[in-house]
Regions:
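Bacterial N-terminal signal peptides that target proteins for export
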Residues: 2-14
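Bacterial N-terminal signal peptides
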Residues: 12-22
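Boundary at the C-terminal end of the N-terminal hydrophobic targeting segment
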Residues: 26-28
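Short N-terminal segments immediately surrounding and downstream of signal-peptide cleavage
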Residues: 30-48
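Metalloprotease/metallohydrolase-associated module, dominated by Zn2+-dependent proteases
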Residues: 52, 58, 63-114, 168-234
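Short, charge-rich amphipathic alpha-helices with coiled-coil/heptad character
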Residues: 114-134
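Short alpha-helix carrying the canonical HExxH Zn2+-binding catalytic motif
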Residues: 131-144
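Catalytic Zn2+-binding segment of zinc metalloproteases
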Residues: 143-160
Length: 234
């Protein structure tokens, strides 16, 4: 059966068709935008470098001075003949990669470059350590502390790259470029700071193990095997 439609009906059908076409075009455009953003994430660059530094030695401080420097002044029976001081550094640079859709929607991933290491690594040996036997034993103990610092940072740098690539390979979406820019540093720090904290906790645990009663007893046995000290030290 043929039906005659009024002009108003045709206009309504035409308007509906145009809306459908517009929605289809917008959907296709959005899919294309998201595909571009995914490729952006796959291209993000992450580098982590361990910056080593030579370990210096200082024998100019007295036992009393080293005790003050170590902060262990509360124990009158505890003498400090050796001390290790590390100055760790953890820095990073972040650069945004983003794409902006025709409607202003923005996706972003960061390029991240991390440098971790030490601005200084010093071991102090008490001035009172005059004979080479005792001095070498104390030096070995302090070098063990320095080695633990460096090993944790060196291994940490190697282990960090893959988790960072995973964390920063998934683009985030924002209503505008301004909104994306505001989230750049919080995003990076939210990923990097927990790692830095875990790294320092691991180092602290290793340092405590080196200074454990078992470790100190081993050092004492070695010291007792040294020839008698001329100045009565250790």
């Amino acid at each position: 059966m043929l039906q005659e439609h009024s002009p108003r009906t045709w206009i309504r059908h035409l308007f509906t068709s145009l809306l459908l076409l517009q929605n289809c075009a917008a959907g296709a455009s959005n899919d294309e935008f998201r595909a571009t953003c995914i490729k952006l994430g796959e291209a993000a660059l992450v580098t982590v470098a361990f910056m080593d530094t030579a370990t210096s030695e200082n024998s100019s401080h007295t036992v009393k001075s080293l005790k003050s420097l170590s902060g262990k002044t509360g124990d009158p029976h505890h003498n400090v003949y050796g001390l290790t001081q590390a100055e760790p550094t953890f820095s990073y640079e972040i650069k945004p990669r983003w794409r902006i859709s025709a409607t202003g929607q923005t996706c972003m991933v960061p390029d991240v470059s991390v440098k971790m290491g030490f601005s200084a690594m010093r071991i102090y040996l008490a001035r009172e350590l005059q004979d080479s036997c005792r001095k070498n034993i104390v030096r070995d103990h302090e070098l063990e502390h320095a080695s633990a610092w460096k090993s944790h940072f060196r291994i940490g740098a190697k282990l960090l790259e893959d988790p960072l690539r995973l964390a920063f390979s998934k683009p985030r979406y924002y209503a505008s470029r301004t909104e994306a820019q505001a989230d750049l540093r919080p995003w990076a720090e939210g990923v990097l700071k927990p790692f830095q904290q875990r790294l320092m906790e691991g180092v602290a645990s290793a340092q405590r193990a080196i200074d454990s009663p078992l470790s100190y007893n081993h050092v004492k046995k070695r010291l007792r095997a040294c020839p008698p000290s001329v100045n009565g030290v250790l």
